[in-house]
Amino acid sequence: MVKSRPLPSIFEFNKLLSAIAKMKKFDLVISLGEKMQRLGISHNLYTYNILINCFCRRSQISLALALLGKMMKLGYEPSIVTLSSLLNGYCHGKRISDAVALVDQMVEMGYRPDTITFTTLIHGLFLHNKASEAVALVDRMVQRGCQPNLVTYGVVVNGLCKRGDIDLAFNLLNKMEAAKIEADVVIFNTIIDSLCKYRHVDDALNLFKEMETKGIRPNVVTYSSLISCLCSYGRWSDASQLLSDMIEKKINPNLVTFNALIDAFVKEGKFVEAEKLHDDMIKRSIDPDIFTYNSLINGFCMHDRLDKAKQMFEFMVSKDCFPDLDTYNTLIKGFCKSKRVEDGTELFREMSHRGLVGDTVTYTTLIQGLFHDGDCDNAQKVFKQMVSDGVPPDIMTYSILLDGLCNNGKLEKALEVFDYMQKSEIKLDIYIYTTMIEGMCKAGKVDDGWDLFCSLSLKGVKPNVVTYNTMISGLCSKRLLQEAYALLKKMKEDGPLPDSGTYNTLIRAHLRDGDKAASAELIREMRSCRFVGDASTIGLVANMLHDGRLDKSFLDMLS
């Protein structure tokens, strides 16, 4: 254009700038505007409006204001379009007070703010969490003779629903009806979706029926919101009925609709229904996405159908839907829980080959699986790899590591890790301390366990019932029954209250020590607390009864 002779008119340049601005290439518009000036092509009001709008869209308000000043010096008066662009810039640029002031200035300057102006300001007020001012502005619009339109009400309904002010959104529907403005499917969808998010499923269904009564045709968004909500409540038949209903009305379900149903069905173990939906998706040429496959794989893993989960994993890869970290984490967890740790390890290696780096969950899951499998050496190797790969262990990782080391007779190694944790900035919780106390007691180092237990109050950590039971069990293993009983007394006085495990541990210890009277007293106390003998206690009493060391009254007391 700039090489044409004669030069095209400013109107032609403005058409070009406007078209580029609509494509949201604001930097290019600004650059072209500067080039026009260098070539001596003067801007007119329309050009300035386009450029000011572009600066505002780029959140460069100061440059927009500078251009406004230049334009006014050249004798151009800003139009309602100019000021609306600035208003939009203020609203999106965290300058809401300037936006409100600008509207007041517009009135003082003799401009009459229109529906677009007010709607822009209302949207800005909601963006800045000023809902009451936004709602009040709707009434002010009417007072100033500017009737809110469907877009205005849509903005207000959306803002209220995002805040959870659903009652106010309903009031607005009534206002619209009084003003003879018919709410459209978008407004109904907004309220229905909000009702679903805040778990008012029956209200959402009632509103759905109301919109149909008013002749407003629901769309795929309406159905998807309701189906997803019904699924989260386990109302499968209602969700399936809605799916049938939308298909009957020639409203094609989309990926969101199918994903909601599939995710819900697999979590409930309804795999036949989930797989039928998956097949139906493919028949309708809707490509399942990573969420679809992850839902199916997660459901299969949750219900211990690992071979089916692996099949689905291989199928998704064959369809060029590549597994993500969630996919691998789900499968690794499933295999480790089912004691198929080798399969989990193989997937872990495959991840690396695909260029995926495991996260804290990946490593922690695999470490736990290896420890449960008795593979202490490889569990430690994976932990070392985790640290060398720069993946930060969390408190759960350390808890699993310490527990695994202690349970596999590696107390010294556990103590090294524990010592490192104490010296670092890791905030240790009661579960970590309980694990170490148990590890010490199991290794016969009850005195060390006792010292650590006694230090908890100095560390500002309150022992829970498991901590007490662990320490009582350790003391009982060394036949330190008086000390164990003293802990029971402390629990009753200071909390936490003893549970079934506390009493059963002490009862067995006194029985093994031959103190029938103390055992009988503990049984009576336990029963008064509505606890009963566990399998280990009943088994011990039965054996002692068989050997003639106890009479039947003990068994009767426990039953």
UniProtKB/Swiss-Prot annotation:
The keyword Repeat applies. InterPro entries: Pentatricopeptide_rpt, TPR-like_helical_dom_sf. PPR repeats lie at residues 9-43, 44-78, 79-113, 114-148, 149-183, 184-218, 219-253, 254-288, 289-323, 324-358, 359-393, 394-428, 429-463, 464-498, 499-533. Keywords: Repeat. Pfam families: PPR (PF01535), PPR_1 (PF12854), PPR_2 (PF13041). Belongs to the PPR family. P subfamily. This is Pentatricopeptide repeat-containing protein At1g63330. It comes from Arabidopsis thaliana.
